[in-house]
Structures are given as C-alpha cells and as structure tokens.
C-alpha cells in the first residue's frame, strides 16, 4: 500500500476468541446510550435490573478542538473557494475519527472493568433530511463507527455485542 509517498505493508489475520457463555439470568450487561452532547452514557446492570455502575463518557477538549477547526473552515470558505479547503476538511475528519476511537476504547474498557458479558447499543437509524441548527453536529456524529469499533474491541476481549430497537429506550431507562 502506498500512502504519502511511502510504502506500507498490511497483513490480515484471523483470531479465535471464545465469547462468554454465561446464562442469561447471571449476565452482567453494559448498556450504552450514544448521544450528541454527551458522547456516551454507560450503565452496568445485572439481568434482574440491579444497577452496578454508571459512567458518563465525554471528551470536551477534543470536541472543542474539532469545533474550532470547523469554525476556521467556515471562515476560510467564506474568503476562498471550497476547493482550496479540502486539506482542512481532511484534518477535521481525522480529528472526528480519533474522537470515535477514544469513545469506543473507553466503552470497552469500562465494560471489561466490570466483567460485562454483553454490551448493548440502541440501533440508531437516521432517515430523512436533517435541517436546522444541529445539522452539522448530526452529520459529524460517528455513531456507526463507534459501534463498529466497540464491537471489534469487545469481541477481542470476549464480550458479546447486541443491538436493540431505539424506541422507548430513553423513556423506559431508569
């Protein structure tokens, strides 16, 4: 693979990992609520509903850096053409991807800390046209990347990942 005038080797490999086979009644669950303002809220609970812990995952300095870069892009686009701003958009994209990696790592670390058997995400589907003030925030929200990265890291640690319907999850959460 050639990138930035340098050559790199990339090897693919498979890894055999046994996922936890705990009975449903004895499982420890890590439920994750991905948000726009707070990056994620993790709740550790038993199958009977006993809450063992809760953690708010937020990286405000990283998000502030990203929004600062987006403001610089906005100012630059006003003065120049949008073609000349591609490198700045690439930088913002890399910052956003790094933020999603940090969030996924923090979720997996928290689940492993409590020896969770399964991590549960809500299945978030975005349909239709987005308008209004939070349009850019929603477009930059890397919910699917966070879920994929977290799934990969969790499977390497032997933790299962499950998706549930997003309907009524916030209303029914205690």
Regions found by a protein language model. Name each.
Residues 5-174:
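Positively charged, helix-rich recognition surfaces that bind polyanionic ligands
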Residues 1-3:
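Short amphipathic beta-strand and strand-loop transition segments with alternating hydrophobic
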């Amino acid at each position: 693979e050639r990138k930035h005038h340098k050559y790199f080797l990339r090897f693919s490999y498979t890894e055999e990992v046994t996922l936890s086979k705990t009975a449903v009644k004895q499982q420890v669950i890590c439920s994750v609520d991905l948000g726009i303002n707070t990056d994620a809220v993790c709740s550790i609970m038993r199958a009977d509903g006993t809450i063992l812990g809760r953690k708010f995952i937020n990286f405000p300095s990283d998000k502030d850096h990203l929004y600062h870069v987006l403001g610089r892009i906005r100012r630059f686009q006003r003065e120049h053409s949008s073609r000349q701003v591609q490198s700045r958009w690439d930088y913002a994209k890399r910052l956003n991807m790094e933020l999603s990696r940090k969030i996924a790592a923090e979720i997996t670390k928290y689940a492993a800390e409590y020896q969770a058997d399964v991590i549960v995400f809500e299945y978030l589907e975005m349909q239709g046209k987005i308008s209004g003030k939070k349009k850019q925030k929603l477009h930059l929200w890397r919910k699917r990347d966070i879920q994929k990265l977290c799934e990969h890291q969790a499977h390497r640690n032997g933790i299962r990942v499950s998706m549930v319907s997003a309907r009524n999850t916030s209303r029914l959460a205690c």
